[in-house]
From Swiss-Prot:
This is SWI/SNF-related matrix-associated actin-dependent regulator of chromatin subfamily A member 1. It is found in: Nucleus; Chromosome. It comes from Homo sapiens. Keywords: Activator, Chromatin regulator, Chromosome, Hydrolase, Isopeptide bond, Nucleus, Phosphoprotein, Repeat, Transcription, Transcription regulation, Ubl conjugation. The gene is SMARCA1. Gene3D superfamilies: Homeodomain-like (1.10.10.60), iswi atpase (1.20.5.1190), ISWI, HAND domain (1.10.1040.30), P-loop containing nucleotide triphosphate hydrolases (3.40.50.300), Tandem AAA-ATPase domain (3.40.50.10810). It comes from the Eukaryota. PROSITE patterns: HELICASE_ATP_BIND_1 (PS51192), HELICASE_CTER (PS51194), SANT (PS51293).
Amino acid sequence: MEQDTAAVAATVAAADATATIVVIEDEQPGPSTSQEEGAAAAATEATAATEKGEKKKEKNVSSFQLKLAAKAPKSEKEMDPEYEEKMKADRAKRFEFLLKQTELFAHFIQPSAQKSPTSPLNMKLGRPRIKKDEKQSLISAGDYRHRRTEQEEDEELLSESRKTSNVCIRFEVSPSYVKGGPLRDYQIRGLNWLISLYENGVNGILADEMGLGKTLQTIALLGYLKHYRNIPGPHMVLVPKSTLHNWMNEFKRWVPSLRVICFVGDKDARAAFIRDEMMPGEWDVCVTSYEMVIKEKSVFKKFHWRYLVIDEAHRIKNEKSKLSEIVREFKSTNRLLLTGTPLQNNLHELWALLNFLLPDVFNSADDFDSWFDTKNCLGDQKLVERLHAVLKPFLLRRIKTDVEKSLPPKKEIKIYLGLSKMQREWYTKILMKDIDVLNSSGKMDKMRLLNILMQLRKCCNHPYLFDGAEPGPPYTTDEHIVSNSGKMVVLDKLLAKLKEQGSRVLIFSQMTRLLDILEDYCMWRGYEYCRLDGQTPHEEREEAIEAFNAPNSSKFIFMLSTRAGGLGINLASADVVILYDSDWNPQVDLQAMDRAHRIGQKKPVRVFRLITDNTVEERIVERAEIKLRLDSIVIQQGRLIDQQSNKLAKEEMLQMIRHGATHVFASKESELTDEDITTILERGEKKTAEMNERLQKMGESSLRNFRMDIEQSLYKFEGEDYREKQKLGMVEWIEPPKRERKANYAVDAYFREALRVSEPKIPKAPRPPKQPNVQDFQFFPPRLFELLEKEILYYRKTIGYKVPRNPDIPNPALAQREEQKKIDGAEPLTPEETEEKEKLLTQGFTNWTKRDFNQFIKANEKYGRDDIDNIAREVEGKSPEEVMEYSAVFWERCNELQDIEKIMAQIERGEARIQRRISIKKALDAKIARYKAPFHQLRIQYGTSKGKNYTEEEDRFLICMLHKMGFDRENVYEELRQCVRNAPQFRFDWFIKSRTAMEFQRRCNTLISLIEKENMEIEERERAEKKKRATKTPMVKFSAFS
């Protein structure tokens, strides 16, 4: 807080020494107070007026705005004289202000200012009528009264009388025009800092930590301009689309006297809005999104904006981006950038922001880069101090722990958990698929490594994210959705405990498909929830937020995708944040936490981060923690982070993938335990404290040379430096698990040699010139491949072939010796073996080509393995008998195929779809059968998943028509779309008539899920009632004497 106060005080004190500072110490709330009017009169003596005069002035401003809007289309380049004069005056004050801050600005101002003929540095100060020599002679003669002429003195007095007083207003309490409640102490200081920037003609960056009220401070500044400077607008506030609603609410809540419009909508709506709302000019502030600015830039260029505010300013850090280029074309008197994340990019991106704020000062990127020497800036303390001095006048950043003492604390606990049995199987399968990458020390493809990382992270989250992993069809939502994921097991226990405590929970994940799984889980457990991701429409987004934040809301969980839900959303009614998975960039996770840990939060916030132990996740979190720690050290010192240190190197990714691989291979059993959630949390809290302590020590030792620590922390593990091992080619060999599979080694060896699957870089070994061409899908007898392999080895022996060493395989020397040993000991085929070989060559499916085989596989996928008749129709030129014979051999010997895992996955996916279609048809039949007139009587139990777009009448029509036409019919949704368009009841329903076939398919899938859930509940009730009746039925005893 002391640094914050000092920074603001230094900025204000750097104003002109002759400036008048009006301190407003106490105000009574109300629409207009005498103190306010008095302060305004003292501040702007030349323009002060009575209340009637102020209204007249405001009317004039509005008429000027209207006139500007009307004239602008004729000549966009035409500059208003008043605006031009203001810009010129601001430039002079800006240069003077910056030079008072530090002489370093002379380096930037001099070259840029000299180019402008109107530069204050090029202006002559005074007009001496007497030459220097003459004046000096008069002084030496004792004549002081004639050294300045009467004309000179008159001109100086007239010039001084024409100057307006440079007044800087400084608030001590919350301004009276702020109606939503008093500003906090640090927010008042932030407002004073913004005012001082405006008065000195300087633009700036407000970089307070998220949740400290940057929005409120910005709105208060615009209110100051209206109430104290008679500048109601026009102002533009440029924000992300997701925060439009929030900005409009904040304007209405805090400074309702500002007339605010929201520019958003489709093409027709925008055209009407421009005509009816924007061009008349009856507004002060225009709030719009980045997308709208890009689409309607010609409209926005017609205005001379008094203040241009950009929220999430990192969007313009690339000066060549479309948005950055467009906003630079707008005419604006002042500019303000808002960002909640620290400046963590390279020097050139910082220059892009400074160039946007002060293009007349920072006009050369090359000059800026050379002055701060990108390579040496982070290591040279003098350059660091120089950069800090340049940033200081423009940048204000405070963090919660320093300024917001009343905000409850935030505590993060990392919960380490194990893999389930299914997760271990899938994790092993992913690693085995790319085992050559794990054990390679040569060149690696970065995209391949990124893909492996992504697949491993999916496995850590939930194995059902992979197609074919979930048991079914039919698919059910019950205990297996929890027990097959280690994270879900812990989450299930944790949520039950939080529900008992009365907490409300935010769950963040990067994967929207995982949110689908969580939705099913919440419906199964009966938890009421809201959901928000990148596909959520703007209206539904706002409705969900309002429903969750409503007083006495019954919503227990709000699930969000990390990227979509990380910005501009206030969910302070929740007090628990669960990070289901972690982002590469720790700032994104911090943004997610700040949805709950922000002003307005009344409870301590607990953050639970789920981490799968001994997997790639452990390394990802460790790297993110190191990066965050280093960022905080550097930013607090006013430095910038070298962007190169943030890039994920290939070696780094490989170490992450390798981490824990041996542990996973060691067993196939589940690592999940029956510990209660209290024990799990205590262990996680202990490990979190240990990691924080370790990082704290690391930070202290890396203040001067932190780049080295990044490498050490990633490459040092369990006391060993893996960089040295890698240089020596001694990286530990990861032993894959022994596969329990019936293997025919002769077949495998033959096709590995023939297809060259695992050795792409080594030239093919020689083969006999007249060897037959056989394929694995032709299913020749295994004995044939033994004879062919023997023939090849003897041929290589006769020509003296020496096996080369392949550096890309494990233990190349050992593999080379074993292969050469086979060749050296080879024997020729005997006459009996040659005759046997010729006989075996006739026993395979020699008339089946690769095309026939592919058709057979696709037909199995389409119809299922048992529908031989339909499969035979798909394989051209083959009779049903031939296909049946081939199918029998295929399913008996399919493990001999090289790509059997891929083939089986393809067929099983198709069969799963077939079973799914059957189960859906049964569900629809059961639902429709319960009604005599389903088109009029059918009801759907929505629960919490109704949505706001489709009505119940529309949903009823979709389901009944889908059942009537046949769910599994080809192009059924396109036909359904035509039925909707022709239905008389929808002739005026524009919404449903404008939906596409794909949208109807998505809606029907949602409705089918609801129907299946309803059917399951009905079946369970019927079973329970049947069981109940059976227990109540009395036993009747018959007697022989009755």
